[in-house]
Each structure stands twice: as structure tokens, then as C-alpha cells.
Regions:
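Metalloprotease/metallohydrolase-associated module, dominated by Zn2+-dependent proteases
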Residues: 11-97, 113-166
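Active-site recognition of the HExxH zinc-binding catalytic motif
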Residues: 100-113
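Solvent-exposed, charged interface segments at domain starts and junctions
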Residues: 1-2, 97-100
Length: 166
């Protein structure tokens, strides 16, 4: 029950601050909601930007994904898809990066659900149209690619080969 209370409080906090500020990435969010509930954000964003079209989509943290910040996986029949967010890359980044990564992946999910677009790397005109629309409304800076290169490099696994007697 405590988890539900936290989700309700997080959603309530999100709604009340959203009414005061049009920007989803306003710096004050870092103090108001520094560790947001991604599921609550997903539901809010789905209603606000995608007319509820992503009801068949799930969002979850990936504890081992370190080569990208987010990924949208298409589950096939029925328009089901899953958004995975990199817990290692996003958990220590500003809230703004989580919001923009989630919205980026939600655009991919929306294009799949509405147009059956299965191009995971597709950032063409339809993607960019939605990206610009949301950036304008929410004052975000959703981009085609993230800039977490230092973090990705930090998580890269290195294989060492012994060149002498081991």
C-alpha cells in the first residue's frame, strides 16, 4: 500500500507543478521530484502528448543496459511494445535527461503503435515532427541522440589479453 501512496503522491506532485510551469525540465523539478516515478511520468506523458495511444506499452528500468540510455522494443502482435530505460546511465543524471529520454522512446513507441513503424533507429520526418511538437509544448530538448558519451565509455567492458606468462 505504501508504494501506491508514493505513486499517488508523485502523480499529485507532478500534476500540481505541471499546472504552474509549462516546462517539464524546469530546474525546480530537481528539488520538487528528484527521483520521479517513471511509471507515473509515462502515464502523464501518454495522456498529454500521445492521446493515450500507448496504453499497451510498458516502461521499465534495465539494470544492465549501458550502451544506450533508452530502447523501445516491439513485442509484435497487438501493437504491444516495451520501453527500457538504462538505470546505470540515467539514475545519476539530472531528472531532465530521464524526462527527455523517456519522451524520445515514447515517440518511437507511438510511431510503432500508430504506423507500425519498426525502424528502431528511425529518426525521420515523422519522428522529428513529434519531437518538435513536444519540445515546443513542454519546453524540453528532446534530440535524436543523447550526449552521455562519457557515461557509456565508463561502463564499457574491457577484455585484456595476456602477452606474457600468465
Amino acid at each position: 500500500m505504501a508504494g501506491n501512496d508514493r505513486n499517488s503522491a508523485s502523480t499529485s506532485s507532478f500534476r500540481s507543478h505541471e499546472e504552474q510551469s509549462d516546462s517539464l525540465v524546469d530546474p525546480s523539478w530537481e528539488l520538487i521530484d528528484p527521483t520521479p516515478d517513471v511509471h507515473a511520468m509515462f502515464l502523464q506523458f501518454n495522456d498529454r502528448f500521445f492521446d493515450g495511444a500507448l496504453a499497451g506499452c510498458e516502461v521499465r528500468w534495465s539494470p544492465r543496459m549501458t550502451t544506450c540510455a533508452g530502447l523501445c522494443c516491439y513485442e509484435g502482435r497487438g501493437g504491444l511494445c516495451s520501453i527500457r530505460l538504462s538505470q546505470p546511465l540515467l539514475s545519476l543524471r539530472p531528472r531532465k535527461d530521464l524526462v527527455e529520454t523517456l519522451l524520445h522512446e515514447m515517440i518511437h513507441a507511438f510511431l510503432f503503435v500508430k504506423e507500425r513503424n519498426r525502424d528502431h533507429d528511425g529518426h525521420g520526418p515523422h519522428f522529428q515532427s513529434h519531437m518538435h511538437r513536444i519540445n515546443h509544448i513542454a519546453r524540453t530538448n528532446i534530440t535524436i541522440y543523447h550526449s552521455f558519451h562519457a557515461e557509456v565509455a565508463n561502463f564499457k567492458q574491457h577484455w585484456w589479453r595476456c602477452q606474457g606468462a600468465c
